[in-house]
Amino acid sequence: MKKPKPNLKINLNKYLLHSSVFAIFTEALKYRFIIDLKLFYLILFINFFLLFKYKKVTLNRFFLSFFAFLFIHGCLTYLWIGIPPNFLLSQILGIALASSYFYNVLKLFTKEEVFILYAKYALILAIIGFPGYFFGFNLNVNYDPRFSSLLTEPAHYAIVVLPACYFYFKRKQYVSFFIIFLSLILSESSIGYIGCALMFILPYINLQRVKYALGVIPFVLVIFYFVYSNNEKVKTRFDDTFESLKVLETGKFDVRTNISTYALLSNLYIAKENFIEHPLGSGIGSHYYMYHNNYKKKMRTPKYLYTLELDDINSKDATSLFIRLISEFGIIGILATFYMIILIVRTFKDKSQIVEQSIGIYILLKLFRDGHYFPPELFFFLLIFYFSYTKSFFFKNEGNLSHN
């Protein structure tokens, strides 16, 4: 087979870079026909074909060991509990496709090329969202008036663009920072507000800057109190969540429990029950099955949620990645989470690790809010973080994005 001409190589690399970064913002671009036909999957299919034809598709030992663990752990727990294997296979297949794709694309470029382009796309996404927000027309399929630009919901928008917001802030590109930061405020997303707070708190958590951190915390509390006092949605969610924590023991929800609180606490209750009975977890992809077949009958769900057909809301992703890891991997999931948090904290001790810090904020928010294993952006961020942080031979250039 003839090798592609130099111009073709350049154009192909440019296409792979731009299409792959663009793909992480395409969660809402889908068409429902029996299953969700997503633009993200189409991009992966086309680009995988190009990679196989013109590049070298590889997997390293870490990937093979990781997939082997997921498969063996899943097989053992599924057989022991009696869970149908389709839950296991669908998750492993999705993770394998998304992770191997980004592994083989990202290794073709430097971190600078990848992350700077991601930040530019995030900025464009924010700018596109302002006309729709201020003039009152939706750019998306949802009917939520809050800021979400082209993404599925305000919370998902906040999680995806927050790394870019932090990146611009640390690079002192304040105009770009302010544009994205303003969009995060307008999203009125609790997870977005938490992420904004983390941007200013996490860089100062080392012992040498404890005094500064203590000074910032009251400022953050004042902002939270202001938002709490003036935003009825945030106030309702916070009050209901605080009052409903006792449901983790009983599983009996008050008839007035709001949807967001129910989504979080019902999945946390299921994860707790599953962890008690299966300390090593029930296997990847099993939370949904355990929710419906084992533990949902123990709960008292508000009747209005049955009317709205939301009685099992977020049961597929457990509402948060941490809750899902507890449910499906038990002690192993807890240890993996703490290990990841340690890695994230360490990045903030090195001023040069701006990219790693940016992604660290994303991971923390992901642990708290979204439990899906392969949304478009997840392995894009995870692979940059892991291989960059461990100094593995992955990118063409191991230098950090620390220069101005």
Where are these regions (language model features)?
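N-terminal signal-anchor transmembrane segment
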Residues: M1-K53, F71-W80, P131-N138, L365
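A juxtamembrane structural motif centered on a specific transmembrane helix
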Residues: M1-Y15, Y54-K56, R171, K349-I354, ...
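Hydrophobic transmembrane alpha-helices and their immediate junctions
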Residues: P6, I10, N314-K316, L321-I363, ...
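Hydrophobic alpha-helical segments of polytopic membrane proteins
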Residues: Y15, R61-S65, Y166-T236, K349, ...
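Transmembrane alpha-helices of multi-pass inner-membrane enzymes
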Residues: L42-F45, M340, S358-L367, G371-N404
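Transmembrane alpha-helical segments and their membrane-water interfaces
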Residues: F48-K55, F69-I127, T347, L365
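Long extracytoplasmic/lumenal interhelical loops at the membrane interface
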Residues: F147-S148, N258-F329
